[in-house]
Amino acid sequence: MNSLLQALHLLRCDLLSLPIGDAQTRSAELTALLRFGADLNIIKRRVVIEVKLCGSLLLNRVESVLRNIYGITPKLIRSTPRNDIGESCFLLRIDDPSLARKLGLIDTSLAPVRGLPNHLALASGSALKGLVRGAILASGVFTESTRKFAMEVYAPSNETALCLQGSINKLNVIAKIKEVRGSYKVVIRDIDNVAPLLRNVGARNSVEKIEQFIKLRHPENLGPRLPNFDDANLRRSAIAAASSVRRIERALQILKGDAPQHLLYAGQLRLNNTHASLEELGKLAEPAMTKDAIAGRIRRLLCLADKRAKTLGIPDTFS
């Protein structure tokens, strides 16, 4: 087993040794794990979930949540070959018609949701950390090139990747989306970003060892970085996005829900996906819309809030 796989094995053991947490946290972790790692099959209008779980610790964790929270006993179909880090893998079938709907994995027409269920997209606190932990356990890997170390989490769709990116950003960690031949993954580059994320989701025991391993292999990453045009552009974009988010937050405080629903929805969508571009934001909307349409709705929301603030004699969205 190479060093990267050893580091991944350490991380998985660390995460799986954590207490499962309260019901909301357990549900968030399970939902993300299934969204990022399971197949949903429709058989005679019944949703059957099949998921490959590697390692007996993960298998026991998932079975425990299914039994204790949802009263479901999944069926172990078969064992599959060991994965790259030597864990035994198991194919688990969950044949319960209500579970996918309870978790928000499907809509009313039995179609899989495009991104993440709404309750996960709005998650915070321990549920947010459970969401990210579940995604990492489902499809997270460590990678490295000549000069760069990264964690990558493979996503089933662009919309799902965008939602995970937003969730990671809520934990004050920079994540980006990369598309390779129609497949999407969320990438967290450099140990300086990866380590805080892993600590946030509970992997405190393994992070120090992973940091030491990376710094020994890539000492050139420890030196100061020279500023460049990309850094400057990123900073300008971040400042503009932060200003927009602050105005929208103030607008929602002023309006207190008294505004057209489609405008409120656009504002909340931006707050839930602070680092997404307008084009990406439009794709996340239900139904999807163009970047001009989503930008127009946000502008009208801000304009309406500023007019309301002037009428009430209170600070507007620029305050």
Swiss-Prot record:
Keyword Iron-sulfur: no
Keyword Cell division: yes
Superkingdom assignment: Bacteria
Any single biological process term in GO: regulation of sporulation
Keywords, ordered alphabetically: Cell cycle, Cell division, DNA-binding
Signal peptide: none
InterPro entries noted in UniProt: Homing_endonucl (IPR027434), Sporu_reg_WhiA_N_dom (IPR018478), Sporulation_regulator_WhiA (IPR003802), Sporulation_regulator_WhiA_C (IPR023054), WhiA_LAGLIDADG_dom (IPR039518)
GO molecular function: DNA binding
Gene3D superfamilies: Homing endonucleases
DNA-binding stretch(es), residue numbering of this chain: 277-310
Family to which the UniProt record says this protein belongs: Belongs to the WhiA family.
Function, as annotated: Involved in cell division and chromosome segregation.
Record NCBIfam families: DNA_bind_WhiA
Protein name as catalogued: Probable cell division protein WhiA
Organism: Tropheryma whipplei (strain Twist) (Whipple's bacillus)
Record lineage: Bacteria, Bacillati, Actinomycetota, Actinomycetes, Micrococcales
